């Protein structure tokens, strides 16, 4: 059973490769995203399926550390990351599409889903009644993530 599904998107005045570099620089997420207070890379090598890291953030009412893992990666167009939080699985898909007359910009779309199939019937009922309170807050966090990704991609574009 899916809980919330949140779609957010923006257009960034930087090419997909630069935006991809920001999204996949998970070791520095705490320096880029205001919703992340700490990030620690747990695997070695380049960003790809299996890359794992731990970060501290607030999402869907959960405050604290969570371990994330890349489950899909199609550089520089699409990636999906997943985290288990309690009995839930939170999955975020990033889709990067070239935009603008010369494809110098990027349309970045994020879809975040919380999968609650492992919750008890009572827990799912409680979510149905009270889960909406976290929806608006989480949507705002994701919109801030988009703003922060845009700011960092633009900053990197102007840094020699």
Predicted regions and their residues:
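Hydrophobic ligand-binding cavity/cleft-lining segments
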Residues: 1-44, 48
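Generic C-terminal helix-cap and adjacent flexible tail
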Residues: 2, 16-17, 151-160
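Beta-strand/loop substructures that line and gate deep hydrophobic ligand-binding cavities in soluble
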Residues: 84-144, 149-151, 160
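A short, structured loop/turn motif at beta-sheet edges
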Residues: 16-17, 44-47, 71-76, 95-107, ...
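Short beta-strand segments that buttress and anchor functional surface loops
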Residues: 51-58, 79-85
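Beta-strand elements of well-folded, non-transmembrane domains
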Residues: 12-14, 61, 114-118
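Short, surface-exposed coil-to-beta transition loops
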Residues: 5-7, 63-67, 88-93
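Hydrophobic pocket/interface hotspot
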Residues: 19-23, 29, 53, 70, ...
């Amino acid at each position: 059973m899916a809980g919330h599904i949140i779609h957010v998107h923006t257009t960034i005045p930087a090419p997909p490769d630069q935006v991809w570099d920001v999204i996949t620089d998970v070791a520095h997420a705490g320096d880029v995203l205001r919703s992340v207070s700490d990030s620690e890379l747990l695997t070695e090598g380049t960003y790809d399926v299996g890359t794992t890291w731990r970060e501290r953030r607030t999402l869907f009412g959960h405050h604290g550390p969570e371990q994330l893992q890349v489950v899909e990666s199609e550089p520089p167009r699409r990636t999906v990351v997943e985290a288990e939080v309690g009995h839930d699985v939170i999955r975020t898909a990033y889709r990067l599409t070239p935009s603008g007359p010369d494809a110098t910009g990027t349309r970045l779309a994020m879809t975040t889903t919380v999968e609650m199939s492992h919750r008890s019937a009572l827990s799912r009922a409680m979510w149905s009644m009270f889960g909406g309170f976290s929806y608006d807050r989480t949507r705002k966090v994701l919109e801030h993530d988009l703003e922060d990704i845009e700011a960092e991609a633009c900053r990197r574009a102007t840094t020699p």
